[in-house]
């Protein structure tokens, strides 16, 4: 018999009521009653002997209201008492102070006008701007009745219209109405004059036996203007022709020595980041200097690698070649096996000596002997052949014409045939 089925186990699970909970509840009730009795014991009962609730003066007593009289009443303001002060009128929401760009322009006119005139002019400009913005932005249409696809199409159309109407290529100006493009042109013109003067000063210093330091001093300004993204168009403009003076910096000096390594490294790194077009290359002539650095043995290997990479990138647009491997045009030629075999046979016949070749006539043999080139003991050195193919080779292998050619699946068929033969032999 298990403990679950035994009556002893059932008796142990029941809660034991020893009277403690009842005693606790009685104690709590007695405490509450004592608290109430203590509060009432402080009240004097003699005060309430003559109390009559009907005659008592109670302010909160409900009053009977005549509905007909209440309908005739009108809404009026509550009368203020003698000591009550009137309330201040509530102020409306103040506008936030906005600082527009026009303030910078108006600062120049501070000497001519006063503060009041500036403030009135600013308010007028703000009013005109707000009116233009309100007129330019039409009210949005209600698109609740449209389907999600039509809403999406309208949103795309609005985005395209906004992109088309957005003004692009505006003339950049400063706050004081100075044209930035004209300033950049003046900066490049001044820098070109100083670069040319630095090259001439370095040549004169080398002729005098002194170190060439003028281009090194001007190098930070040159690299800074070449690495600025916002002036790339002006630097690469063929009319400005700034790259021609960069070529002067990279050219060897009059004594044949190359410019300093810092000049080569910084300028080549800056040229590698630029997207130079064909017109700029032709007008500046910087490609000739890059070709010189690829063929000369004086530059460092790192400079030579950058020059070779630049030469490959710049020669593609000139030679009308693309860097896309899929669009490459590979030169191929048809191979005539019979013609090649005939040419090989004629070549082998021409290599025979007079004694080995059958001479049909003595006159022809004498003529060939006189016309044969003289061979000395010192043979000429063989010219190195090109390491890559100029014409792509074509494979002439035909797998189906080979002696050991087997079609696809022939091995499986042969194995199946052997299995059937074995089964026939066993059956016999």
Swiss-Prot record:
Places the protein is found: Nucleus
Predominant localisation class: nucleus
Domain (TFIIS N-terminal): residue spans on this chain: 244-321
Annotated Gene Ontology cellular component terms: nucleus
InterPro entries in the record: RNAPII_TF_IWS1, TFIIS/LEDGF_dom_sf, TFIIS_N
Keyword rRNA-binding assigned: no
UniProt-annotated stretches for the region Disordered: 1-151, 346-381, 393-412
Biased composition (Basic and acidic residues): 1-16, 58-71, 81-94
Gene3D superfamilies: Conserved domain common to transcription factors TFIIS, elongin A, CRSP70
Bias (Polar residues) ranges: 346-359
Gene Ontology terms describing biological process: poly(A)+ mRNA export from nucleus
Protein keywords: Nucleus, Transcription, Transcription regulation
Acidic residues bias (residue ranges): 39-53
PROSITE patterns attached to this UniProt entry: TFIIS_N
Function: Transcription factor involved in RNA polymerase II transcription regulation. May function in both SPT15/TBP post-recruitment and recruitment steps of transcription.
Family named by the database record: Belongs to the IWS1 family.
Protein name (record): Transcription factor IWS1
Gene transcribed to yield this protein: IWS1
């Amino acid at each position: 018999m298990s403990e679950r089925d035994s009556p002893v186990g059932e008796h142990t699970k029941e809660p034991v009521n020893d009277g403690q909970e009842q005693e606790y509840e009685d104690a709590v009730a007695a405490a509450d009653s004592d608290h109430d009795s203590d509060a009432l014991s402080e009240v004097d009962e003699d005060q309430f002997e003559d109390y009559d609730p009907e005659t008592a003066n109670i302010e909160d007593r409900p009053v009977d209201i005549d509905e007909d009289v209440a309908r005739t009443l009108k809404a009026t303001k509550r009368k203020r008492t003698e000591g009550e002060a009137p309330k201040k009128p509530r102020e409306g929401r103040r506008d936030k102070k906005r600082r527009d760009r026009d303030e910078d322009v108006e600062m120049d006119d501070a000497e001519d006008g006063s503060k009041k005139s500036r403030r009135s002019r600013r308010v007028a400009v703000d009013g005109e701007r707000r009116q233009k913005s309100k007129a330019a932005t039409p009210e949005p249409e209600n698109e609740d009745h449209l389907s999600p696809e039509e809403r999406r199409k309208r949103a795309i159309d609005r985005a395209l219209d906004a992109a088309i109407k957005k003004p692009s290529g505006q003339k950049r100006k400063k706050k004081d109405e100075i044209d930035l493009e004209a300033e950049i042109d003046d900066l490049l013109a001044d820098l070109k004059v100083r670069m040319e003067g630095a090259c001439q000063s370095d040549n004169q210093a080398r002729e005098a036996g002194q170190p060439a330091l003028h281009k090194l001093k001007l190098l930070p300004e040159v690299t800074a203007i070449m690495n600025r993204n916002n002036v790339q168009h002006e630097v690469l403009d063929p009319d400005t022709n700034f790259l021609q003076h960069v070529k002067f910096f990279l050219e060897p000096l009059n004594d044949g020595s190359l410019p300093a390594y810092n000049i080569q490294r910084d300028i080549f790194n800056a040229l590698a980041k630029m997207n130079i077009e064909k017109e700029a290359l032709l007008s500046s002539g910087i490609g000739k200097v890059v070709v010189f650095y690829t063929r000369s043995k004086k530059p460092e290997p790192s400079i030579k690698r950058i020059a070779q990479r630049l030469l490959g990138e710049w020669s593609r647009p000139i030679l009308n070649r693309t860097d896309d491997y899929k669009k490459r045009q590979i030169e191929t030629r048809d191979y005539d096996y019979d013609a090649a075999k005939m040419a090989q046979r004629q070549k082998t016949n021409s290599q025979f000596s007079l004694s080995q070749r059958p001479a049909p006539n003595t006159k022809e043999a004498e003529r060939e002997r006189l016309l044969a080139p003289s061979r000395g003991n010192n043979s000429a050195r063989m010219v190195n052949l090109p390491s890559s193919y100029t014409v792509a080779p074509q494979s002439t292998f035909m797998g189906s014409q080979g002696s050991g050619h087997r079609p696809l699946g022939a091995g499986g068929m042969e194995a199946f045939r052997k299995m059937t033969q074995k089964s026939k032999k066993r059956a016999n």
